[in-house]
Amino acid sequence: MCTVVVSVAPGSAWPVVFLGLRDEVADRPWDAPAAWWPELGDRVEGVRDREAGGAWLATATAPARASVVLNRREEPAPPAGGWTTRGALPLSAAASGALPGGRPTTRAFNLLAADADGARVASWDGAGLTTETLAPGVHVLTHGSTDDLDVPRVARWLPRFRGVEAPTGPPTGPAGASTGPDDGDRGRWEPWLALLRESTELPADHDEALVRADLLDGRWFGSLSLSLVAVSADQVRHEHHRLDRASPLVGHFA
């Protein structure tokens, strides 16, 4: 299941930043972020799932927004008309700012939606749809509730992420320029990236691992990509990296 670490800092130049690890079956085809949906125009980009046609993570400009969907662990009964893809949710949230309402026809999900005003999480567990506004500070989302300490990797790593400096902006500026006063500042993402590197010392199938890999019904399932996202009043930045199954993070953040 995916993992998202998000920092909410009201009043700052970049009020919401988040790190997302996308976990998926390795042979499910997907594409790196781009404007894959002509009906949404050039302002909406996302990590496209070719199989279902939606997005795992989407960003939009004018106004600046970002949204990412995570699968929950519950298995609701299928609706009469069949399932719709969860991948439509971040596209809608990024494009319009709207969160889902009514009774969703998707499988269970957590949906993070971020803009300059903060971050909200819509959760559907098959029984009810709830929405919460994240308090200032650092939070971790997985397949359970927000900051769910019953999830082993949340229990281990949430205190660690809260114990280091959170990023203050995008990791890179236009054309790869540094965002900080010194070369290599990278928006002060290094403390979070250092924790990711530390987490890879665990076996990839360990319950507390952040960067994950395991066999699921004979198919390799694991962390396929890493996204670093920052949202300001008028900009959204998304730095995206494919991860190597054999050596995740090596070569990107060594």
Language-model features, listed with the residues they occupy:
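N-terminal nucleophile
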Residues: M1-A254
